[in-house]
């Protein structure tokens, strides 16, 4: 499941053509929808994937590689 989440994250980020590979909560929702999972489950798995680090801003939490 970790590999599926990682691949979904990378696919969505490539589709968005983002710089810095940011995974805001909205992307977590997109990954969850794609994999038929809960967004919180996606975020918990994403935290455990090497290279994805949890960070915070004033408005949202995010993950990045």
Regions found by a protein language model. Give the residues of each.
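Surface-exposed, interaction-prone regions with an acidic/low-complexity signature
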Residues: 1-34, 40-65
């Amino acid at each position: 499941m970790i590999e599926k989440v990682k691949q979904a994250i990378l696919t969505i980020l490539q589709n968005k053509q983002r710089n810095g590979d940011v995974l805001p909560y909205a992307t977590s929702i997109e990954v969850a929808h794609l994999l038929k999972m809960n967004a919180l489950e996606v975020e918990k798995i994403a935290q455990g994937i090497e290279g994805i680090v949890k960070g915070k801003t004033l408005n949202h939490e995010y993950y990045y590689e």
